[in-house]
Amino acid sequence: MSIQFNQVSYIYQQGTPYEFEAIKNVSLTLEQGKYYAIIGQTGSGKSTLIQHLNALLKPTTGSVNINGLEVTNKTKDKHLRHIRKEVGIVFQFPESQLFEDSVEKEIEFGPKNFNMNLKNVKDKAFQLLLELGFSRNVMSSSPFQMSGGQMRKIAIVSILAMDPQVIILDEPTAGLDPNSKHQVMSLIKKIQIEENKTIILVSHDMDDVARYSDEVVVMNKGTIVEKSNPRNLFSQKTQLLKWHIELPKVVKLQKDIEKKYNMLFPKLATNEEEFVKLYKEWHHEK
């Protein structure tokens, strides 16, 4: 399932003194099965962009082609039902949207609206919850007797269990403890690889962006200013400073060592394991 933006602009409160153009003439292609990260300063247009991915917002000008359906400002909502099933969005702090008195009912809510097979959805949700460290009686438990991190995981699983082809995650690990963060991000990566899902991650955590994504889209003032793989992107230190984007911790460490010893590693590490391997190879040859 591919998604293509064709010269898309979106204006909030158009025609009023408060109108604001949040994204400007954006053209972008997102391919099936890839893991994308969308990064940029607060206010750069990231949230507006992702709301076009399942037509929660429609372009003011331009069009978005979602799996063959051309969405413009004239597209009727009745044509968008299938898209909203296939493109799942996990918004920031999704635990605030939980309202059912059991995990099972919470999992069932979305699928009922799409007339999905509830047994299949619940079976998938149960397996995902076990992978995230829940006990086997989780489905009968109340989300409101759980920690904030556990509620976040349940909210995320409620989207994943509907088996969307495209999974959009807006700051999914903000505020989670390191163990929960690792569980969630590892599960998402596993789903991408094993089920050929398209993942779109919006994040200010450059460590996650470097480790998990295949391609990174950089937004600045409503436009796309760069689309590259993490290794190439995080090699552009001067340009990243201009866009107010920090380097991942592992990249900072590598740069510091290269500067201290006046040397260069053969490539830029995008995660700790890769850095350790490069460092050992260099230290052995030294």
Swiss-Prot record:
UniProt entry tagged with the keyword ATP-binding: yes
Localization: Cell membrane
Listed PROSITE patterns: ABC_TRANSPORTER_1, ABC_TRANSPORTER_2, CBIO
EC number(s) given by UniProt: 7.-.-.-
GO MF terms, alphabetically ordered: ATP binding; ATP hydrolysis activity; ATPase-coupled transmembrane transporter activity
Main localization category: membrane
Keyword vocabulary terms for this entry: ATP-binding, Cell membrane, Membrane, Nucleotide-binding, Translocase, Transport
Pfam family, one: ABC_tran
Positions of ATP binding: G40, Q41, T42, G43, S44, G45, K46, S47
Function, in words: ATP-binding (A) component of a common energy-coupling factor (ECF) ABC-transporter complex. Unlike classic ABC transporters this ECF transporter provides the energy necessary to transport a number of different substrates.
Sequence similarity: Belongs to the ABC transporter superfamily. Energy-coupling factor EcfA family.
Protein's UniProt name: Energy-coupling factor transporter ATP-binding protein EcfA2
Organism name: Staphylococcus epidermidis (strain ATCC 12228 / FDA PCI 1200)
